[in-house]
């Protein structure tokens, strides 16, 4: 049974249809990337999965339960990290972490202390003195110090420096190795590419692609750079070959995977001296869907001002009690 199962999910806010028949499957033990621009429906979906919003229609199951009816029980089995963490200003970071842990039924004290050291977080400081990055660390430590079945991470590394991002990635790999499942929503495509087993790309409230990176790469073109002994002619006429041009004596082009064999035959006949073939990156797959409209529509949900480049479109709606414990 999938850890997360969504079928034909619909959610509207007045005249705005934030989710328009969304489908999503997240399997046990996988790290699943959840991608889309601001306004695509990512955070609305996550809020439904957390039991913070009620769906209009369709089906949503988390760990075999209904997230709206069984929210209290589910919150003891999952951990949530938003992209903009709000904390109680008069508590210390350590007190906030412990409170989040209590909401989930406790945390591993040894893991807590190890994570505080790894993330270089001073737990004795008041939360009001923390930078954005340190507030993120509080939620991340609280989440990863808990032995839960599901981690829901919505732009979790927003505000972290590259060293801390590397520590975060190590922790995701650790919980995966321990058998947990991770839903990771992120604008850092390199992070998703490094961590995720499968990826779902959504737009305007619908899933437009879902699969492993290898599967999705078959849906786009491969970049080829070649140097030959004899001039290349007629490449533009080959099926599936695009954007042929020369730079410094080398021919650059893109080819659809189904036509790669035919292209290679033509190249060999011209005497290949050097050839490099580069599969598409996750960023290229993403831009295939959003390159014509990077902003991709209105804000996700009814809250004005939510969403900016590099941050989740509903982060600011998540209050302190949910920051590390939902």
Predicted regions and their residues:
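Walker A (P-loop) phosphate-binding loop of ABC-type ATPase nucleotide-binding domains
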Residues: 37-41
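Conserved ABC transporter NBD signature motif
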Residues: 54, 58-69, 73-74
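Catalytic Walker B motif of ABC-type/P-loop ATPase nucleotide-binding domains
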Residues: 151-155, 160
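ABC transporter nucleotide-binding domain
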Residues: 168-254
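Short, charged/small-residue-rich alpha-helical element at the C-terminal edge
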Residues: 221-293, 302, 316, 326
